[in-house]
Amino acid sequence: MGEMEREGATAKVGAGKVGAGKVGAAKAGAAPAAAQGAGTKVVAAQGAGTKVVAAQGAGAKAAAVGVGKVGAGAKAVGGTIWSGKGLALGLGMGLGAWGPLILGVVGAGAVYAYMKSRDIEAAQSDEEVELRDALS
């Protein structure tokens, strides 16, 4: 039940994660261990089922790099503003591009309320001074 990351693709090896069932679990679990022991490269392709490919040589490394680039490209497209992963505050609230806008509106409202309360306090203070002067 291990998890490996190679070249931007993730291979999950386990009884419930291989193909459509448990049939290839033992073979899939043994393939990465045998492949790494021999100094070969393990590449995983994400699709309907997880495929583990043990490759060796320059051509296989080039193929592995190609798989990594496809995974990175898909990740870059998936992380846009509209999915909530691009332009965001990182608050974990799922606001996406709306987060900075909402924060700006709340900030502007707070500044407006503060300035308004200062004006009201100044007016009350002036009234109190006038009242004190009138009573004395």
UniProtKB/Swiss-Prot annotation:
Q: Name its cellular compartments.
A: Magnetosome membrane
Give the superkingdom in one word: Bacteria
Region described as GL repeat: 86-95
Give the protein name, as stated in the record: Magnetite biomineralization protein Mms6
Residues in compartment: Lumenal: 107-136
**InterPro entries given for it?**
Magnetite_Biomin-Domain (IPR053517)
What is the recorded membrane topology of this protein? Single-pass membrane protein
PTM comment for this protein? Answer: May undergo cleavage.
Question: Which family is it part of?
Answer: Belongs to the magnetosome Mms6 family.
Q: Which organism is it from?
A: Magnetospirillum gryphiswaldense (strain DSM 6361 / JCM 21280 / NBRC 15271 / MSR-1)
- Entry keywords, A to Z: Biomineralization, Iron, Magnetosome, Membrane, Metal-binding, Transmembrane, Transmembrane helix
GO CC terms of this entry: magnetosome lumen; magnetosome membrane
Further remarks about this protein from its record? This bacteria makes up to 60 cubo-octahedral magnetosomes of about 45 nm in diameter which contain membrane-bound crystals of magnetite (Fe(3)O(4)).
- Could you list the residue ranges that cross the membrane? 86-106
